UniProtKB/Swiss-Prot annotation:
One of its GO terms (molecular function) is toxin activity. It comes from Centruroides ornatus. The keyword Secreted applies. Keywords: Disulfide bond, Ion channel impairing toxin, Neurotoxin, Secreted, Toxin, Voltage-gated sodium channel impairing toxin. One of its GO terms (cellular component) is extracellular region. The lineage of its organism: Eukaryota, Metazoa, Ecdysozoa, Arthropoda, Chelicerata. Has the structural arrangement of an alpha-helix connected to antiparallel beta-sheets by disulfide bonds (CS-alpha/beta). This is Beta-mammal toxin Co2. GO terms for biological process: defense response; envenomation resulting in negative regulation of voltage-gated sodium channel activity in another organism. Residues 1-66 form the LCN-type CS-alpha/beta domain. Expressed by the venom gland. Disulfide bonds join 12-65, 16-41, 25-46, 29-48. SMART domains: Knot1. The keyword Hydrolase does not apply.
Amino acid sequence: KEGYIVNYHDGCKYACVKLGDNDYCLRECKLRYGKGAGGYCYAFGCWCTHLYEQAVVWPLPKKRCN
């Protein structure tokens, strides 16, 4: 599974500026989803890869980004 890492409080994606390989996105994806996850900046949001099927990613049901 893949997807944008999401802030549970506001429903927004984790933003990033440096597209492609991005240490911030990689670190945040690993913190949220475990050591096996990958991450990079895609379309100014942190995109996480190699996730488990039940991983919660953006968009959150019934929670819109404010």
